[in-house]
């Protein structure tokens, strides 16, 4: 029947997984709702591991649907995904989340944003296209984690977005392999050189964020790994399927 392609969207309100054939006809799909937590006024946070669990469940539903329709899940050539570009979690050396996933709806960084913006800096607009900080920027969430998360201060290794977090777990990657694509990079708001598609050491120094915490920047179509045996068993797709 030809090659199939699996994609997911790890969004604010749901995780959606779909499989398409080579003519871009949808042949299977499934979605599950996400959970938004509001622990304090102005705070909005999620669970990165719920994103992984929902994706795995949706993938299993899709592989079952494919089999019912006479398709072979082993024909899936690649697994791809996108998610929330203005949201991050902190991970440990094993690649596991040790902080909540804070997204763009959160405003806990308002005072810090006001403090940053009290000193106008030309570099923000020149390098990122954003003239000032905003509560929705992951750069500000990173500053908050570095100041307020004991878990990250003790064991934190990288900051990652939700889609890369899911893809890392599907491929069994550790923090040393943490990544972000150059489209999602723009969601950071500050801390990068948009034209060069690299992190800005000068901006990160101003922000007080050590570059060691930043994931490597890849092309959106780069292959990051292969579906592990464990995830193959859980999802019903073939071990070794490319993850990108």
Regions found by a protein language model. Name each.
Residues 48-51, 55, 109, 138, ...:
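Conserved donor sugar-nucleotide recognition element shared by glycan-biosynthetic enzymes
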Residues 1-100, 115, 215-216, 232-242:
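N-terminal glycine/serine-rich phosphate-binding loop of ATP-dependent small-molecule kinases
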Residues 106:
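Carbohydrate-associated surface elements
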Residues 112:
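Active-site metal-coordination/substrate-binding segment of hydrolases
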Residues 85, 109, 141-144:
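Hydrophobic side chains within alpha-helical segments
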Residues 10-12, 125-244:
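Gly/Ser/Thr-rich active-site cleft segment
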Residues 121-123:
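Metal-dependent DNA phosphodiester-chemistry modules and their immediately adjacent helices/loops
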């Amino acid at each position: 029947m030809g090659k199939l392609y699996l994609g997911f969207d790890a969004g604010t309100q749901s995780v959606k997984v779909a499989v398409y054939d080579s003519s871009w006809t949808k042949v299977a799909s499934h979605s599950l709702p996400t959970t938004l937590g509001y622990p304090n006024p102005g705070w909005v946070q999620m669970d990165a591991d719920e994103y992984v669990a929902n994706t795995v469940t949706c993938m299993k539903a899709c592989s079952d649907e494919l089999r019912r329709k006479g398709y072979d899940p082993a024909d899936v050539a690649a697994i791809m995904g996108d998610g929330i570009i203005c949201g991050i979690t902190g991970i440990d050396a094993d690649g596991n989340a040790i902080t909540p996933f804070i997204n763009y709806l959160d405003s806990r960084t308002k005072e810090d944003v006001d403090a940053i913006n009290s000193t106008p800096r030309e570099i923000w607009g020149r390098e990122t296209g954003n003239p000032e900080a905003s509560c929705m920027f992951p750069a500000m969430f990173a500053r908050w984690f570095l100041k307020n998360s004991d878990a990250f201060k003790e064991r934190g290794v990288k900051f990652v977005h939700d889609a890369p977090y899911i893809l890392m777990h599907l491929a069994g990657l550790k923090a040393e392999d943490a990544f972000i694509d150059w489209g999602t990079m723009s969601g950071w708001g500050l801390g990068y050189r948009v034209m060069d598609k690299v992190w800005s050491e000068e901006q990160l120094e101003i922000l007080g964020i050590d570059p060691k915490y930043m994931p490597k920047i890849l092309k959106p179509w780069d292959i990051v790994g292969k579906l592990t045996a464990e995830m193959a068993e859980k999802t019903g797709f073939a071990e070794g399927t490319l993850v990108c």
